[in-house]
Design a protein with these regions (language model features):
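Outer-membrane beta-barrel translocator domains and adjoining extracellular loop/strand segments
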Residues: 1, 40-48, 89, 94-103, ...
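Extracytoplasmic loops and strand-loop junctions of Gram-negative outer membrane beta-barrel proteins
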Residues: 1-2, 11, 50-58, 67, ...
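Outer-membrane beta-barrel proteins
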Residues: 3-5, 17, 57-61, 70-72, ...
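Membrane-embedded beta-barrel scaffold of Gram-negative outer-membrane proteins
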Residues: 4-56, 65
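Residues that define the transmembrane beta-barrel architecture of outer-membrane proteins
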Residues: 9-13, 63-67, 114-118, 193-197, ...
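Residues on the lipid-exposed face of transmembrane beta-strands in outer-membrane beta-barrel proteins
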Residues: 15-19, 69-75, 84, 120-124, ...
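Gram-negative outer-membrane beta-barrel transporters
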Residues: 32-35, 53-148
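C-terminal beta-signal and adjacent terminal beta-strands/loops
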Residues: 37, 129, 138-177, 192-196, ...
Length: 270
């Protein structure tokens, strides 16, 4: 908090229930509702170039609402243990106060508003020396803001690119009005869903000195899902073979990290 920025605050209410169904599984369910105030978001059109204005002048304060319900089922039978978790959630932001308006004062989804989350985990112990594990996770994509439309400003000066021809005989030049991007609403785009499968096996053994050592062999993202790390706008240029005119269209491209990654780990306890 500063002299201009108030401390963030929140109130959360939750209620839950637990039930054990003998010889089948343990079940739990919990619902929550959370209100938040004095949240910070960058203003529409805020520029990050230069330091002519203080960061406090580039942000707005607003409120948020989040609510959801969580389910969990667990079971242990023999040497196998597993659980399944599912969460349905929603998180919105509202910036409608005078001087702090974002998105025309209309409600918009938070960046990490993920509607669905699923976690499935299982472990099996073959013996005191060997155990295996598997885990699968899924979540809906995060929200992001992109400008899908452009327009030419009426009052912007046109500039002319000199006429010229390249070595292939293509002609260039003409008037080009200044264009501006138009964002329909805040966080108007969703990343693709995130999911992956991880597998692992542990080999345990006691050393002659009585220390426990473990070899772990794991595979992260077994089926090499290309989950989005971030998405960016790319200008795609194509040429019409008949008119020999170039046309530029904006497309979205996805950058990914961490495809399938095998690993080996050695641990000794002493």
């Amino acid at each position: 908090a500063t002299t201009k920025i108030k401390p963030m605050k929140s109130h959360q209410y939750a209620v839950g229930a637990f039930y054990s169904l003998k010889d089948i599984a343990d079940f739990s369910v919990e619902g929550y509702y959370k209100t938040m105030d004095n949240l910070l978001e960058y203003k529409d059109g805020a520029s990050f170039m230069g330091a002519s204005t203080n960061w406090e002048d580039k942000v707005s304060m607003g409120r948020g609402i989040a609510y959801g319900i969580e389910f969990l089922a667990q079971r242990s039978f023999g040497n196998t243990t597993g659980w399944i978790g599912y969460t349905w959630a929603k998180s919105d932001r509202i910036f409608d106060r005078p001087g702090n308006i974002i998105n025309n004062g209309k409600r918009f989804p938070a960046k990490y508003d993920r509607r669905h989350d699923v976690n499935i985990t299982a472990t099996h112990k073959f013996s005191d020396r060997i155990d295996v594990s598997a885990s699968w996770v899924f979540s809906s994509g995060n929200a992001a803001t992109f400008a899908f439309h452009e327009y030419a400003a009426i009052d912007s000066p046109n500039y002319r690119q000199p006429d010229y021809s390249d070595s292939n005989g293509f002609h260039y030049g003409g008037f080009y009005p200044e264009t501006h991007s138009h964002v329909e609403s805040r966080n108007n785009f969703r990343y693709s869903n995130y999911h992956r499968l991880d597998l692992g096996v542990n080999f345990h053994k006691m050393t002659k000195r009585g220390n426990q050592r473990t070899w772990n062999i794991s595979v992260y993202n077994v089926y090499s899902r290309l989950n989005p790390f971030y998405v960016y706008v790319w200008d795609e240029s194509t040429r019409d073979p008949e008119t020999e005119q170039w046309k530029t269209t904006k497309t979205l491209r996805q950058a990914t990290l961490f495809p399938i990654i095998p690993s080996v780990t050695y641990t000794i306890k002493f």
